[in-house]
Amino acid sequence: MKNLNKFVSIALCSSLLGGMAFAQQTELGRNPNVRLLESTQQSVTKVQFRMDNLKFTEVQTPKGMAQVPTYTEGVNLSEKGMPTLPILSRSLAVSDTREMKVEVVSSKFIEKKNVLIAPSKGMIMRNEDPKKIPYVYGKSYSQNKFFPGEIATLDDPFILRDVRGQVVNFAPLQYNPVTKTLRIYTEITVAVSETSEQGKNILNKKGTFAGFEDTYKRMFMNYEPGRYTPVEEKQNGRMIVIVAKKYEGDIKDFVDWKNQRGLRTEVKVAEDIASPVTANAIQQFVKQEYEKEGNDLTYVLLVGDHKDIPAKITPGIKSDQVYGQIVGNDHYNEVFIGRFSCESKEDLKTQIDRTIHYERNITTEDKWLGQALCIASAEGGPSADNGESDIQHENVIANLLTQYGYTKIIKCYDPGVTPKNIIDAFNGGISLVNYTGHGSETAWGTSHFGTTHVKQLTNSNQLPFIFDVACVNGDFLFSMPCFAEALMRAQKDGKPTGTVAIIASTINQSWASPMRGQDEMNEILCEKHPNNIKRTFGGVTMNGMFAMVEKYKKDGEKMLDTWTVFGDPSLLVRTLVPTKMQVTAPAQINLTDASVNVSCDYNGAIATISANGKMFGSAVVENGTATINLTGLTNESTLTLTVVGYNKETVIKTINTNGEPNPYQPVSNLTATTQGQKVTLKWDAPSTKTNATTNTARSVDGIRELVLLSVSDAPELLRSGQAEIVLEAHDVWNDGSGYQILLDADHDQYGQVIPSDTHTLWPNCSVPANLFAPFEYTVPENADPSCSPTNMIMDGTASVNIPAGTYDFAIAAPQANAKIWIAGQGPTKEDDYVFEAGKKYHFLMKKMGSGDGTELTISEGGGSDYTYTVYRDGTKIKEGLTETTYRDAGMSAQSHEYCVEVKYAAGVSPKVCVDYIPDGVADVTAQKPYTLTVVGKTITVTCQGEAMIYDMNGRRLAAGRNTVVYTAQGGYYAVMVVVDGKSYVEKLAVK
């Protein structure tokens, strides 16, 4: 087949080139002829089966050559020693309460004589080699009757959230081992109907949650969309993060982002559920949350290791998934479960960082998307799902991905795959991994790539998600971090590597049933089922496992219970390189507005209005518009619009409000310029330092005034008897080195650790761990003695407040693989230096001649009562700044929106934003989208947006659209202009 529009690269691991051959069967189809003939609500359903693609494979047995039959989606559930006779299953929606029955309406068959059907090897686990398991003929081969007997049966009913279902099984192959007669049913028509008896596992329904409609349509042949009235229409439902107490303070950024992108997310501390935390308590809590009014709990994320939040353990089972199995007594999840397994704050932070970056920061430049890795063992065959070997199985998946649009498929198939093959694939950039083979707690069997190799991964934020079919790769109860945990915690130079999410088993997996689950996961991912489109990792994987349970019954249930999601179950998956969305929104809204309309050129995108991690409304884009209903707005001065879409760049915009005047003055004159590979931001400080420790409002004759009360006119540092020490550096040597300030309050280290006659603090890299012990204070606060320290100031600013007094101090300058220097020129080491109360000592490191040195600036009233926060494209990149300059490294090649916000003790200012556009792209940065004139005492602002004029106390004096005119009384004023969601602030003086 030729495709002139797309080139697909198929790469083979080098170990497979040459010498490899295997028998290639005709690829099996995946669309058996099973169709719905009639459905009258849940009372009567008629279904017809027609045989499709029946094949026979010859195998050697103790009785000679025998036949193993296979057909499309047929599954061998025969016990060991019984004839191998695949069945096929389909799920139906049935009555909520009644017992159901199945009757054969009609059938057609043919018979083959003198056929020896091979005995089943039973359920084979993936820690076994199928070839080494012998064929054993059981007692059934001496019985003169047809097996399995009935050609149509019903399983016990199950409940999937709001629908009761039941599986009808077709057994079209019937075999008499004594007469060696194989009866092949080419067509079977059945009727499934309700009886007058009450059935098992009944459903007491309160209503349906519309977010699962697609799942029902895919799961149940006879499901009728909209036959139930949803209680509440919610696009994404709700997520609860259950977090161990020790990580409660570390989860905020994750929760804020989830709310910002439109998923209502709440936090529950595990120890507040029960102390000690038990699996039963977690299970009961999730059930209670699910049963709350609205019926919208969709995701639960567990944060902590097994010892923090235990898995549910029963004989042969270690399960997180059972926490999501709530309604009925079956193994179908109503809630998607995931886990950030962590043993330290660092473990947790990297999982949070990778998840947020994946959803928020991926751009059209991320060309690694659309590239996939398929890994397979050299085993499997007739007893596996669809009769496929692992290699055949992965080839089916590879073909599916190629048809969907993946541009590169790397195939690593045994024999001979090495860890380097896998490392190279990861480091080259891939977005999806499918693994089918053997496994251990710490490695993949094929390639032997394991936890010891993870440190060699350098795929920083180019993270695939993984569908993993293997034994115990996800056993997080193991004595050391398991394979899945290692991939989720992996870092290189502080940046996430490894994977963004992985589904892996806590126990030994069966050979065949997970293959069916993996097939379905990839089919859902590639949108093969229009009635079951899923965009989250939890949705894709769980729905894939539903197909496994439907076909493999009890074994499928066991596999589902133990197939664990490591990562965020609500993760919005990406498959191909994203494209941009065109989004427009009002520059300003009223706090009293009931809704806001957002235009977007991608239907299905989710648009959300939020502020500081609180969601005020969310809607899906339909016909180019999302109408967001707003609730909960109070006095927010700015709002954030976030729009996410499948395989789209995330769009984040600022929307201003016309609420009460903000007493917290913003920065002004924000600029963005290029210095090498850096974008340098500069701005002017707020006009008045708002010292607002008390912020009250009172009404006088109907005029609302804002009163700012200061505790004292004296600077805080002076009152507390402290001095502020600030260290600032910006890649002085351009080699990754930095600086540390060491402060000795006993002032007895000059001539000891601090040499009096040299600028070498330590002569080599064998640095004692306690070298800095005599120094009571350091900048940064956790400075460590090393030639390559973890904590130093390389590109940025840090400060510490110290009691005023006499100190010895030095500025350490570590050099990798050499020594620890003391910086050269200026006050870089001092004996008995007096730091005065109420003053700020700012050490700015610079290149001076052929060496380095510092400029020391001493100012009164150190410890400003506000700091600056910098945002890039809506994402916070730096906070706690005290300087009016910030350098963003490595960002000069692309356009960005930068915003600066002033954070005061009691509130924050409006953001002021500027567009940075690289040289040669467009010279528009100097063009302000407004004009500002002062004639006499008349201020005139003209723009295509909103304009506001404030006095220096923060009172708004005039506001309007397009043109605002105000007659001033003399003095200083601030003008804010908002155009296309971006804010511009200027100060001016009127004489």
Curated annotation (Swiss-Prot):
Residues noted as binding Ca(2+) 4 in the record, renumbered to the chain: 520, 523, 529
Main localization of the protein described in the UniProt heading: secreted
Gene3D superfamilies cross-referenced by the UniProt entry: 2.60.40.3800, 3.40.50.1460, Gingipain r, domain 1, Immunoglobulins
Inhibition and activation profile: Requires cysteine for activation and Ca(2+) and/or Mg(2+) for stabilization. It is stimulated by glycine-containing dipeptides. It is resistant to inhibition by proteinase inhibitors in human plasma.
Catalytically driven reaction(s): Hydrolysis of proteins and small molecule substrates, with a preference for Arg in P1
EC number: 3.4.22.37
Any one GO MF annotation of this record: calcium ion binding
Ligand binding (Ca(2+) 3): 388, 393, 519
Entry-linked CDD domains: Peptidase_C25_N_gingipain
Positions of the propeptide segment: 25-227
GO cellular component, one term: extracellular region
Database matches in SUPFAM superfamilies: Caspase-like (SSF52129), E set domains (SSF81296)
Localization (cell): Secreted
Example of a GO biological process term: proteolysis
InterPro entries (UniProt xref): Caspase-like_dom_sf, Gingipain, Gingipain_N, Gingipain_N_sf, Gingipain_propep_sf, Ig-like_fold, Ig_E-set, Pept_C25_gingipain_C
Binding of Ca(2+) 1, residues: 305, 476, 485
Pfam families linked to this entry: DUF2436, Peptidase_C25, Peptidase_C25_C, Propeptide_C25
Name recorded for this polypeptide: Gingipain R1
Organism: Porphyromonas gingivalis (Bacteroides gingivalis)
Gene that this sequence comes from: rgpA
